[in-house]
């Protein structure tokens, strides 16, 4: 079931020539859908405008999970932070939308997170590391990067 959901989400959000990458990150593949708090979806556009951002959000609101046999109502979280909905029969789609430049900044500021994302094989378009890679994790990253060790 999750493989079908992953494939559906990847193709659903890879709907425009301006979108360079769609990657599903997190534990969706390893868990039952009922045990998943949210589905993390990274979307990288070549250049993100206000109109394209709104187009992605509008497109997301039209998603129909019932078409693939999943009877859950999708709830959107287009913020970069966690947002949990405690509604039964729903699943949170956590859309993290970047353009190439903001993705580069995220790699620089949060190399641990981005390194983890790069390891995902659940993507369409360019691999995240093809857009801008985490070259290596440095000792200083353990202290100064977001999600580093304090």
Tell where the protein language model's regions lie, with residue ranges:
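Catalytic core of pol beta-like nucleotidyltransferases
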Residues: 1-18, 29-36, 45-150
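Hydrophobic/anchoring residues in structured secondary elements
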Residues: 21-24
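Acidic Asp/Glu-based divalent-cation binding sites
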Residues: 38-40
């Amino acid at each position: 079931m999750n493989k079908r959901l992953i494939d559906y989400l990847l193709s659903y959000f890879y709907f425009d020539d301006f979108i360079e990458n769609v990657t599903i990150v997190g534990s969706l593949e390893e868990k039952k859908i009922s045990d998943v708090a949210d589905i993390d979806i990274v979307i990288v556009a070549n250049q993100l405008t206000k109109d394209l951002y709104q187009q992605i959000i509008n497109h997301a609101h039209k998603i129909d999970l019932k078409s693939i046999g999943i009877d859950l109502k999708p709830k959107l979280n287009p913020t970069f932070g966690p947002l949990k909905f405690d509604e039964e029969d729903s699943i949170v789609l956590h859309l993290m939308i970047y353009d190439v430049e903001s993705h580069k900044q995220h790699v620089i500021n949060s190399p641990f997170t981005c390194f983890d994302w790069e390891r995902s094989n659940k993507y369409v378009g360019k691999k995240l590391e093809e857009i801008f890679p985490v070259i290596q994790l440095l000792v200083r990253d353990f202290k100064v990067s977001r999600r580093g060790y304090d």
